[in-house]
């Protein structure tokens, strides 16, 4: 996680948690002159649009006062959804046995994209089974990882 994301996580997660939600993860996406700050929230009872609005109002106030982002951006508060992104080792561990789609920052063993069964986590490596071949992907090389929802 970059130092900017760590700073945002440290600033925003306590606000989300004080409202009774889990801060699932934070993304900051640079899009030219305008960027996107996306905060994923979760709750045991699920997330409704009213929950997102409530958290967004609180986070907006904190962001206005603390001003941690020097460029123009849009704040988006969202549920992680069924194809939820994975951010932490604990989230990978909780989803062992699920199908995942992983994109790396740079090629590993000749490829950047992996789609398969999340077999486990070994220290700082994510174990993924793709076409009967097991890959140990260093978590710090993962750019993006999402659960592939099952509809059965």
From Swiss-Prot:
GO BP terms: ribosomal small subunit assembly; translation
Compartments, record wording: Cytoplasm
Recorded superkingdom: Bacteria
Coiled-coil intervals: none
GO cellular component: cytosol
Function recorded in the entry: Required for maturation of 30S ribosomal subunits.
PANTHER family cross-referenced by the UniProt entry: RIBOSOME MATURATION FACTOR RIMP
Family statement drawn from the similarity comment of this UniProt entry: Belongs to the RimP family.
Record-linked NCBIfam families: PRK00092.1-1
The protein's name: Ribosome maturation factor RimP
Species the sequence originates in: Stutzerimonas stutzeri (strain A1501) (Pseudomonas stutzeri)
Lineage, highest ranks first: Bacteria, Pseudomonadati, Pseudomonadota, Gammaproteobacteria, Pseudomonadales
């Amino acid at each position: 996680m970059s130092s900017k994301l760590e700073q945002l996580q440290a600033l925003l997660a306590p606000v989300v948690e004080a409202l009774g939600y889990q801060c699932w993860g934070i993304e900051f996406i640079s899009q030219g002159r305008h960027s996107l700050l996306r905060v994923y929230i979760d709750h045991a009872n699920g997330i409704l649009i009213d929950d997102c609005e409530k958290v967004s109002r609180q986070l907006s106030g904190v962001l206005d006062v603390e001003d941690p982002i020097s460029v123009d951006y849009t704040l988006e508060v969202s549920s992680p959804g069924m194809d939820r992104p994975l951010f932490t080792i604990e989230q990978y561990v909780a989803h062992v046995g699920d199908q995942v789609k992983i994109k790396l920052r740079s090629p590993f063993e000749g490829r950047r994209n992996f789609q398969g069964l999340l077999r486990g986590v070994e220290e700082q490596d994510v174990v993924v089974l793709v076409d009967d071949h097991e890959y140990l992907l260093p978590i710090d090389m993962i750019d993006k990882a999402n659960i592939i929802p099952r509809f059965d």
